[in-house]
């Protein structure tokens, strides 16, 4: 049989088939089946901070503002704990790299989520930056700079490879990709 071994983002893969973040990768059981079917690596379904915030917002009680803060913290911790457990369980049942994927809205969450995912055993991190800008005052080029800033902050706190996932709303993707690699990205994906 042909040897399909390759390297991606510094990770050794038995083949170049990487299962992307989706509903197919949201449980350790599914991930085990994907690994057994021959996947070279798995990107877990993304954890979206925005979804956590929306869920907390939907449960707000306007008559008890203090309780809303506790509720938001509880939901955040619960969702993050579930995701960290997904990493740990997937690592137990898979013999291939497990890549955590995060999409955060606030700068502090990127760093906190990244550290905890590395500690949970993720082999690499995919940073999914997707934000639709509707503010007319938003400075041209700020979105691209945000990618570089987030990467730089995360690289300071984790040792595992950081993969940057780009959306389709960039003014100059080639220049941004060059800057991401120059600032330590292990890989860039679309």
What is each residue range found by the language model?
Residues 1, 16-19, 74-76, 139-140, ...:
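Short linear motifs at secondary-structure transitions and domain/linker junctions
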Residues 2-11, 22, 45, 57, ...:
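Flexible, active-site-adjacent loop/turn segments at secondary-structure boundaries
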Residues 67-74:
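Short glycine/proline- and acidic residue-enriched helix-loop micro-motifs
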Residues 1-18, 83-91:
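N-terminal amphipathic alpha-helix/helix-capping segment at the start of soluble metabolic enzymes
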Residues 15-31:
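N-terminal binding-site loop/beta-alpha segment at the start of enzyme catalytic domains
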Residues 27-65, 78-99, 103-190:
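Alpha/beta enzyme core
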């Amino acid at each position: 049989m042909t040897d399909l071994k390759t390297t991606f983002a510094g990770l050794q893969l038995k083949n170049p088939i990487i299962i992307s973040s989706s509903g197919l990768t949201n449980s350790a059981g599914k991930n085990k089946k994907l690994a057994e079917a021959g996947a070279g690596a798995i990107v877990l379904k993304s954890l979206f901070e925005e979804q956590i915030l929306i869920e907390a917002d939907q449960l707000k009680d306007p008559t008890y503002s203090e309780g809303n803060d506790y509720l938001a913290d509880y939901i955040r911790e619960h969702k993050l704990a579930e995701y960290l457990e997904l990493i740990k369980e997937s690592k137990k049942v898979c013999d291939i790299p497990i890549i955590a994927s995060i999409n955060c809205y606030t700068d502090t969450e990127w760093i906190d989520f990244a550290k905890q995912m590395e500690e949970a055993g993720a082999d690499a991190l995919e940073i999914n930056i997707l934000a639709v800008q509707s503010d007319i005052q938003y400075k041209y080029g700020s979105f691209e700079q945000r990618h570089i800033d987030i990467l730089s902050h995360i690289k300071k706190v984790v040792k595992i490879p950081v993969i940057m996932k780009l959306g389709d709303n960039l003014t100059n993707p080639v220049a941004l990709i060059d800057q991401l690699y120059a600032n330590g990205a292990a890989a860039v994906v679309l």
